[in-house]
């Protein structure tokens, strides 16, 4: 889906993700697992952008799992112990060199670079 240009890949700091997850939990009664908190934060960003611009959009996000098995991450966030890692593009590129390329029909699955977004 990313390769087809149908979705964007962005980087969102952990604290923003967990803030969105707590708002979601308060409103929906579901504690999200840490993984979907990124999608929730992106949906919140999109909704706020629409609020500012006056644009009306349907915003869809996915929620997988629940956070009951990873409450330690929520505890770190609530106690102010969570940090946002701000890795440089060079550090990320170096780390990506050790990740094996998985190909489908001899074509790498990821051709376009992921983009970092500023907060």
Language-model region placement:
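Active-site/ligand-binding loops adjacent to catalytic centers
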Residues: 1-30, 76-119
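Fold-independent oxyanion-binding glycine-rich loops
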Residues: 12-14, 34-36, 62-64
């Amino acid at each position: 889906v990313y390769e087809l240009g149908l979705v964007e890949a962005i980087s969102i700091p952990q604290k923003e993700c967990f803030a969105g997850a707590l708002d979601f939990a308060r409103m929906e009664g579901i504690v999200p697992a840490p993984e979907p908190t990124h999608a929730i934060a992106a949906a919140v960003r999109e909704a706020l952008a629409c609020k500012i611009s006056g644009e009306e959009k349907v915003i869809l996000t996915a929620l997988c799992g629940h956070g009951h098995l990873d409450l330690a991450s929520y505890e770190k966030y609530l106690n102010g112990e969570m940090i946002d890692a701000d890795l440089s593009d060079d550090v990320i590129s170096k780390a990506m060199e050790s990740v094996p390329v998985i190909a489908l029909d001899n074509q790498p699955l990821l051709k376009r670079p992921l983009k970092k977004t500023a907060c």
